[in-house]
Amino acid sequence: MPQSSRYSDEHVEQLLSEMVNVLEKHHAPTDLALMVLGNMVTNLINTSIAPAQRQILARSFAEALQASIKKADKAH
């Protein structure tokens, strides 16, 4: 999603691969996978971000998600 990151592509891809493997291991359909990932994002925001910043971060995350979907739609 972000244009630049302090994390290496390799590290991001490794975590992504491991998370996909867990979802596949549990044969999670798309709706369940999205629900679990959404709950994970909510938990991270609520436990790791100061209350005053939560809405701003959630909005920014949602905008980045929408932008990445639009970008993927144009590529197909």
From Swiss-Prot:
Superkingdom assignment: Bacteria
SUPFAM superfamilies: YejL-like (SSF158651)
Organism: Pectobacterium atrosepticum (strain SCRI 1043 / ATCC BAA-672)
Family according to the record: Belongs to the UPF0352 family.
SS bond partners: none
Name the UniProt record assigns to this protein: UPF0352 protein ECA2748
UniProt cross-references to InterPro entries, sorted A to Z: UPF0352 (IPR009857), YejL_sf (IPR023202)
